[in-house]
Amino acid sequence: MANNGVDAAMRDRVRQQLEEVEQRFNVKVLYACESGSRGWGFASPDSDYDVRFLYVHQPEWYLRVEPQRDVIELPIDDELDVCGWEWRKALGLLKAANPTLIEWLDSPVVYQQNDAVLAELRALVPQWFSPVRARWHYYSMARKNFRSYLQGDEVRLKKYFYVLRPLLAVRWVEAGRGVPPMRFAELLAGSELEPP
């Protein structure tokens, strides 16, 4: 797994959390990655760790008649925000071209993964990617972040990136380049913006 700026102690802590999830909920984590500013490539010293994972239950869970909860969310602490989606839910979201899940699959910070399963899942992305949905998702995100983060008298530099990144993703999609990369630097490099 690539390090990408996450120190060994934090990686160990994340892996320990994932092991606890597996034991507590009787699931198997197939994939775990970093989302948010660390995955986008512009974490600040006070950034938390947004750990996202995909998991499967034991076979008997899938034989129940009543629908079961398909999300695992741990209480957020000062450093860790850990949340996962059940595998069937993830497949449905991928089929619906969910940009958030597609970003997770492109994260440069991977804590653990089942290589064979993830290779098959990633191979589905190009056929289910929807430029229309991606454009709308990123445009809506930029608008929401602009309203939430850039309206005060003092704005932290990092908050501008929360607006710029989705706008660059919109440009990427509108240019017909396919799935936008998760990393801000890649989006910027591929944006073909003219210098001032």
Predicted regions, residues:
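Helical scaffold of the NTase/Pol beta-like nucleotidyltransferase catalytic core
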Residues: 1-33
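Short loop/turn segments at secondary-structure transitions that flank enzyme active sites
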Residues: 57-60, 97-100, 144, 169-170
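Catalytic metal-binding acidic patch
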Residues: 36-77
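A basic- and aromatic-enriched beta-loop-alpha substructure that forms the phosphate/nucleotide-
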Residues: 64-141
